[in-house]
């Protein structure tokens, strides 16, 4: 759970035209759902056609100290109040992490309103880790 809450980059694995398709995404996790945003494209088409997906998240300090989570879940597109809530969570979590020149204003998010907010309800989660303590 900690890895899912802490990180913001995941990989989603899904089936696209009968083949495995894995794509990195930014996300936010609320304890039940992984929320993401996407413009119309291959990722959304694949998840709409095959809503059972896999989500992978990792936290790597170095090759001897890492944690990872693999979760299976069901994709759904958000509408109405769910869209607004998902978009707000994503903006609140991800915007502070953007690196912008000092004199540049924050990005205008209105263009993203044309995209889709989706969520993946996680059904089954597994985790692995390696931790080597220094001598």
Regions inferred by a protein language model and the residue ranges of each:
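A short macromolecule-binding patch
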Residues: 46
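Short beta-strand segments
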Residues: 7-39, 55-56
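Charged, gly/pro-rich active-site loop segments
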Residues: 64-135
């Amino acid at each position: 759970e900690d890895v899912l809450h802490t990180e913001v980059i995941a990989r989603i694995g899904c089936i696209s035209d009968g083949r495995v398709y894995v794509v990195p995404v930014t996300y936010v996790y609320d304890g039940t759902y992984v929320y993401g945003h996407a413009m119309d494209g291959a990722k959304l088409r694949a998840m709409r056609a095959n809503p059972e997906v896999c989500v992978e998240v990792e936290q790597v300090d170095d090759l001897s100290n890492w944690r990872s989570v693999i979760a299976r879940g069901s994709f759904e597109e958000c509408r109405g109040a769910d869209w607004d809530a998902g978009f707000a969570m994503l903006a609140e979590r991800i915007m502070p992490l953007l690196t912008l020149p000092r004199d540049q204003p924050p990005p205008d998010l209105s263009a993203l309103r044309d995209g889709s907010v989706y969520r993946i309800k996680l059904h089954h989660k597994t985790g692995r880790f390696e931790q080597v303590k220094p001598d």
